[in-house]
């Protein structure tokens, strides 16, 4: 099929020849049936295959002052001498006349086309993902997954967006003014940007969801945990290991001096709790680039408003890295082991304020291979030893 020459006048005959000669018998019958209804105007869009998996679109608008048949098809059996003119007869002009035809520019907006424009190698069109925690990190993770064509998201967060963290969150000041929960505000924003995305929201704590409906997570393929609370992550770790779901834990160090992704698949060695125990005792996360026993929280507005400083670069960078790890997981790179993947962030303000780096930070500076390591089972870990007995499916 060759598209019409833009330098030549477009006619109904041009389109009729191009279309009817390249349709299957089933589609041709449907097209002929459509043509048997009179119309004053319509737009015809033609799909032209250019490869096995790709096609282009072109089309035209057809307009007439009166209702007419779009194209004329003669399905009658030819009769002998039917086409022979009688002597002295005059040829009758068609009462149908012709349409005014104007070329139109066709722009695709379907999901498959948008995803293909990103050079995406992975098929996200049937993937369903859970995001627990929609703070600065979780909001950017949700946005990235939406842009990449994920099929469905389950968003979990009980909090409202506040002015205190608006400068480092994907959502804007309008979400603060409307005084709605993060899950609802993020759903509204993502649906406006990607109408094809299916979103399920839960504006309550993860623990409450598990107690009320533990089967909610069964249809989902993957979990991002972007919460900043260690105890909640312990419970997330315990629950999803129990039901066999892979979780990617994403967290930031104070001041954005480092950020970390921990991929935990239940069949493999190690878990999130392994990072928080040493010699049988609970300790600060062992992946951290900040030495323990330091106070990083600041208070500006009031005694009730505390925060740990970092700018928007840190959560957006962590979210981008988290998506990269997810892609590697889908590609089978971590099928036999759990993985801790760290990145060194900005250290200017951290050092300026006199904070101390951890031993791991200096070790990673000397040997960058230590930033990406396989997770091993910690003999002190209560979860891996079977000693973690908390059952969040039961009421407190």
Give the label of every model feature segment.
Residues 1-96, 218-222, 226-396:
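Glycine-rich phosphate/adenylate-binding loop
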